[in-house]
């Protein structure tokens, strides 16, 4: 099915596509392409819409590495969107490392996986 956005898309609105990454990986898993394609469709329909791709990591490992990895994850998503015809000028990226966890946890591997994620935020 197609993703339909029923909420008006205003600056700061966050879209959680449940795109998660393997440990120490910046590679987008193929099962997430359809979710990213819903953003491609949205950006092709809303020609003036700009977004911020936020990369996140779990708390495992050194924060310096987590920030680098979360930046690389955000950039991987930006590059995917560009490969589908979206102008890179419409997409900002930022990596937060482990500073904004979706879930707080005590060393739980399922929750760690949910914190290794991407969020899309409306920028205008």
Indicate residue ranges for each PLM-predicted region.
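Periplasmic OmpA-like peptidoglycan-binding domain that tethers envelope proteins to the cell wall
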Residues: 27-33, 54-124
